[in-house]
Regions:
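Alpha-helical substrate-recognition element adjacent to the catalytic core
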Residues: 1-74, 147-168
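Alpha-helical scaffold elements adjacent to nucleotide-binding pockets in ATP/GTP-utilizing enzyme cores
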Residues: 18, 43-47, 85, 113, ...
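Short, surface-exposed basic-aromatic patches at helix termini and helix-loop junctions that form
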Residues: 24, 45-54, 91-98, 119-128
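Hydrophobic alpha-helical scaffolding
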Residues: 34, 76-79, 108
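Von Willebrand factor
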Residues: 71-95, 118
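Conserved Lys-Pro-Asp/Glu-containing loop-to-beta segment of HAD-superfamily phosphomonoesterases
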Residues: 86, 92-111, 115
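Acidic, Mg2+-coordinating phosphoryl-transfer loop and its flanking beta/alpha structural elements
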Residues: 111-168
Length: 168
């Protein structure tokens, strides 16, 4: 809810401590991806500041643009929002750190969609499923992802899978 205060936001046990440790590592880029609407940015930044965590980037869903453009389904669909952001972020990593081995760690608070999103993401990154596989397209369709988002996901997946990189 947009009227929430930073102090009202609940934190999962040990999440703050874990993120504080990670945010203090100099060789680590920490990104915060949330399906919360852009209107929550100030509240979330205040909560992040209260928890003494430092993120390199914060991604929030632009629900206003979605509503104004008539893509109401996109407001509710977390996969079509989060998966492209993760893929684009990963592409930036392999472009910036192509000669280095790097690690990525994903954890979330959406017990329904995050496991699906992370499984699809990991399958792409680890090249377990091909970007042009009919199965891959069926998986994306089964997540109710709009056609234009499926094409964008396939294109980013292609770019990722054509690159050489070491990741864990």
């Amino acid at each position: 809810v947009v009227t929430e205060k930073a102090s009202d936001k609940k934190t999962f046990p040990y999440a703050t401590e874990t993120l504080q440790i990670l945010s203090n590592k100099k060789d680590l880029r920490l990104r915060f991806l949330s399906a919360s609407p852009e209107q929550m940015r100030r509240v979330l930044q205040k909560k992040i500041q209260m928890d003494e965590i430092s993120f390199d980037e914060v991604f929030l869903k632009d629900t206003t643009s979605m509503v104004m453009s008539g893509t109401i389904r996109g407001v509710l669909n977390q996969v079509s929002y989060k998966l492209p952001v993760l893929l684009q972020s990963f592409l930036q990593c392999i472009e910036n750190f192509s000669e280095q081995e790097f690690y990525h760690l994903l954890f979330g608070d959406d017990s329904e969609d995050d496991p699906i999103i992370y499984t699809i993401f990991e399958s792409i990154v680890q090249k377990k499923i091909s970007y042009n596989s009919p199965i891959f397209e069926r998986i994306l369709e089964s997540c109710s992802i709009p056609e234009n988002a499926i094409l964008a996901i396939q294109e980013m997946s292609k770019k990722i899978q054509q690159r050489e990189y070491k990741t864990h």
